[in-house]
Amino acid sequence: MKAKFKILIPEPKSKFIRVKCRQCNNEQVIFSNATFPVRCLSCGAQIVIPKGGKAKIEGDTVRILG
């Protein structure tokens, strides 16, 4: 019989993501479970669309932080 291992310190499934805007190539840090639409700081294009749980990322993912 195999022993089940418990996760001693649970980690969150949400992360911070560095995203590049497709229109102006501006890089911006966003939250993966964003609840509000995120717009690019330089051109104003919408980068993230909230979908209830995980947000839909419209830009290009550069790097996952943390």
From Swiss-Prot:
Quaternary structure and partners: Part of the 30S ribosomal subunit.
Pfam families: Ribosomal_S27e
Family: Belongs to the eukaryotic ribosomal protein eS27 family.
GO biological processes: translation
Name of protein: Small ribosomal subunit protein eS27
MF (Gene Ontology): structural constituent of ribosome; zinc ion binding
Cofactor section: Zn(2+)
Organism: Sulfolobus acidocaldarius (strain ATCC 33909 / DSM 639 / JCM 8929 / NBRC 15157 / NCIMB 11770)
Bound cofactor: record note: Binds 1 zinc ion per subunit.
Origin: domain of life: Archaea
Family matches, as InterPro entries: Ribosomal_eS27, Ribosomal_eS27_Zn-bd_dom_sf, Ribosomal_zn-bd
GO CC term, one of those recorded: ribonucleoprotein complex
Record-listed Zn(2+) binding positions: C21, C24, C40, C43
Entry keyword set: Metal-binding, Ribonucleoprotein, Ribosomal protein, Zinc, Zinc-finger
Renumbered zinc finger spans (C4-type): 21-43
